């Protein structure tokens, strides 16, 4: 039984059930409710509005049924259950009187069975009804609109019969009875089963090996796949005070019903930096589906690569896209396609690398026909919007910069792929190296080389470390420090393996590089041309035009493109987009065909085509032209900004002093190399100074602050790659701010190393805000060199553990300028308490410590209290969202009783009861400095509040007391009123969220306006 109250309590779950399937499932529930006469015809018409989001219709249905009383609620739950059961094993047999005297009524009573019987025959029935004059041509065309599935067309025919009085209902009742009964579900048809089998085989073959990261051998995905840090994006600012940082998720959470930004959208977005493992994640999804291990709710999975789709020049339809560009049905093409249209909820489409799709997303051109051809970009954009294959799931991967606000409107859930955790790096290396001792030595090398360890949180760098393990373990010099160092190491690895045996033991010396310089320049020219033309997949004709021969290809940087339709000639692509950028930078540094002046376009990150001149420049071919400068400049101007930034950083690294001798031996003119270096230095300094000049003046009374623009981090990265201290000093000379914000900027360990390299030269200390990034423990270690230039450091929501904070504090003890630390929303436990206590005890100029939303218990609070006893400077202490309990509150209260400087204390959401409140009340009686005490979200109850009220009577400093959501009744409020009568200092007492009646709230507010209810 289900009462109306129980029904209302289940409302959110019922909405989830109704919208979790497809529109077909929702309409089958309406069929049942109509046939049981739970819904009237007027109710039904209000629930079948075309174009309305399914969630709106579901809520309207719940409202309609609730108004019909307990019986209606029970019937809806029964209909949901029956619809779920019938989707597994439908009962197609229905019995009705074909010669009924009330045909319209019988059509409604037997509607579910009639819809199922009509499903496979609706086109023939429409033709017959038109021929016999029961419907007009206009009515027939309306029912046959391509946006409707076969079952929806059947329902619309029945709806028409209900309102027409010309015998259509009697005709249908008689004719449908004669139709053959299907003995199985439509997708059990031989054609569909054969197609599903073929599709699984093809997807399994395409996804079993990781060929994109290796030109010499294939790596079995099952053997080396390592979970990446995947977090769901939430709307910042929408969460309450106890909002936790996103938890790391598994692949199975991609289609979870939680965390929806837009529950009516179909598209799941996965964003991550270049090399973070987006393509490999999709490949693992494909493999798990194809081998039957997961994602079996989908009958069909269609993988696509955006870099390959953009090469499709001719118009194509949904059918062409699925069949010609993924998997062709050997038989029954029309039947298979019709099933796909009828069951979109059983389809998953994946689109990898949207950042490599040269067309910018727009929703201006609507295309709703699955059979009419259109351009590839219009087709893709309408699939993502849901105008085509609505309710089919689509997964889109991209680098963050390529995702516009327009596109995010159509995103159901957004995930952030943050790369490997420290444990992930170790696990990956152990999977790659099962020989005794090799993985241990590599892991030890990383742990003792923080710069290299910081790079490896991106899987592409972990792969490089694995690939170059011999070079790393045997080399006498220092380990790679910059991204450029790492790519030169992998270049050395590829060159050695392609060289004669007697040269295989050499490092990347001039002779090894010179021997392959023509090959590298040809590959670099192809890479640059591809970047400028947004071309990442190269045909045989394009390779021939670039004079790239089989010997060049054998070097290993070009591999067969994945996801190629069987039987077609496989085009080639670079191992990874970052390799394409690296080789393009190599060409720009060493080619005699590149004028030095062209390099300035690398550091000017305007959108391609932003000037009239760039739009007038002709499309250029790979071969050189007599206008060399305009050719290179045009390609750089048309390169996507994120690829341009990566290329610029590589160019800066190649022109560093570290690699000067290596490149000078390969460059005919050392003077030319020096000119390029000078040009890059000038461009970097100029771009940074221009950036700093754009900072608006400070608001009167506030510190001058700067929120980094997108290009700022890449300029800093380029400075770091160049490794020139003097240039870093000159660059920050113009930075005159007190607060530097880099929130939500994708700052990882590598970016931390670059920031530290530059910011340590600041003349005036700054407050550095790095909230909502991926700093982690390794990133904290990278930041240590610039800690002396920071007066405040904000690291909210950065996946930092005790180990990282202990290292930070060890260094901070010697940094006189550092006065504030914000560490909330991390993974801190009692294990860091001794270090934090030491910080408080030793730094007598320290002002603010915020440790909210971590995992500190009473034990940690007791240790911290010892540090507080020896501290005389702290003004702000944030502990909200921990688990200190009564014992922890007692320890902190005792330590703060005679503290002379603390003004603000937050213990929100710490499981504090009346015992802890009594200790805090005793503290209030003695403390003469505290101005604000935040105790919301605890369970103080009246006993605890009465104790606090006694403390207030003897307190002369507290101005704000926050007691919201503490189960306080009128008794506790009365005690507070008595205390307020003798306390003129206190200005506000927050009592929101406590169980007061409206009458009590009105009475309390009239008695003292300082009570905020």
UniProtKB/Swiss-Prot annotation:
Keywords in alphabetical order: Adaptive immunity, ATP-binding, Autophagy, Cell membrane, Cytoplasm, Glycoprotein, Immunity, Innate immunity, Leucine-rich repeat, Lipoprotein, Membrane, Mitochondrion, Nucleotide-binding, Palmitate, Repeat, Ubl conjugation
In this chain the CARD domain maps to 1-82, 107-178
Q: How does this protein lie in the membrane?
A: Lipid-anchor
Annotated stretches, region: Required for CARD9 binding: 214-247
Positions annotated as LRR repeat: 764-785, 789-812, 817-838, 845-857, 873-893, 901-922, 929-949, 957-978, 985-1005
Concerning PTM, the database record says:
Palmitoylated by ZDHHC5; palmitoylation is required for proper recruitment to the bacterial entry site and hence for proper signaling upon cognate peptidoglycan detection. Palmitoylation promotes localization to the cell membrane. Palmitoylation protects from SQSTM1/p62-dependent autophagic degradation.
* Motif ATG16L1-binding motif, chain ranges: 36-50
Residues binding ATP are 272-279
Q: Summarize the subunit comment.
A: Homooligomer: homooligomerizes following muramyl dipeptide (MDP)-binding, promoting RIPK2 recruitment. Interacts (via CARD domain) with RIPK2 (via CARD domain). Following RIPK2 recruitment, RIPK2 homooligomerizes via its CARD domain and forms long filaments named RIPosomes. Interacts (via CARD domain) with ubiquitin; inhibiting interaction with RIPK2. Component of a signaling complex consisting of ARHGEF2, NOD2 and RIPK2. Interacts with ANKRD17 (via N-terminus). Interacts with HSPA1A; the interaction enhances NOD2 stability.
- Family per record: Belongs to the NOD1-NOD2 family.
* Function text: Pattern recognition receptor (PRR) that detects bacterial peptidoglycan fragments and other danger signals and plays an important role in gastrointestinal immunity. Specifically activated by muramyl dipeptide (MDP), a fragment of bacterial peptidoglycan found in every bacterial peptidoglycan type. NOD2 specifically recognizes and binds 6-O-phospho-MDP, the phosphorylated form of MDP, which is generated by NAGK. 6-O-phospho-MDP-binding triggers oligomerization that facilitates the binding and subsequent activation of the proximal adapter receptor-interacting RIPK2.
Q: According to its record, what is known about the domains?
A: The ATG16L1-binding motif mediates interaction with ATG16L1. Intramolecular interactions between the N-terminal moiety and the leucine-rich repeats (LRR) may be important for autoinhibition in the absence of activating signal.
Name the UniProt record assigns to this protein: Nucleotide-binding oligomerization domain-containing protein 2
Give the source species.
Oryctolagus cuniculus
